[in-house]
Amino acid sequence: MSIEGVLKEGFVTTTADKLINWTRTGSLWPMTFGLACCAVEMMHAGAARYDLDRFGVVFRPSPRQSDVMIVAGTLCNKMAPALRKVYDQMAEPRWVISMGSCANGGGYYHYSYSVVRGCDRIVPVDVYVPGCPPTAEALVYGVIQLQAKIRRTNTIARQ
């Protein structure tokens, strides 16, 4: 957290936006939407070697308890309404990480009649993680990029 000033009396001054965003970056609770082989790498990122828990990322089983959705894998046309329904059940503010070539743009199955050519056609995506499949390190980097994006956003609406 960048603190604008520390006074000699022991007070710390900052804005409410920066304080709220700093607390949000330390408690991201993702809802996993694993559709293909990228989900295996997502499990690696949550395991002991990479340990997303150290960033405050704790996987949740319910969309009502989540504020981040990680879409990992090929999204077909029949699964798209379910993806949107799960996204709509998440509380605000909510963010989406698109993980892998298939989730980003259809990947290997881009020209198939049954594949959505990117989950950004169904839900707004905040961070794209490239690769086929992307490594666990790439997902950790994507989470760090999402934390940086959250720190930059304005939380309190200004007139």
UniProtKB/Swiss-Prot annotation:
GO BP annotations, alphabetical order: aerobic respiration; electron transport coupled proton transport
EC number in record: 7.1.1.-
Any one Pfam family match given in the protein's UniProt record, by short name: Oxidored_q6
GO cellular component assignments: plasma membrane; respiratory chain complex I
Record's keyword terms, sorted: 4Fe-4S, Cell inner membrane, Cell membrane, Iron, Iron-sulfur, Membrane, Metal-binding, NAD, Quinone, Translocase, Transport, Ubiquinone
Family to which the UniProt record says this protein belongs: Belongs to the complex I 20 kDa subunit family.
Protein name: NADH-quinone oxidoreductase subunit B
Species this chain originates from: Paraburkholderia phymatum (strain DSM 17167 / CIP 108236 / LMG 21445 / STM815) (Burkholderia phymatum)
Gene: nuoB
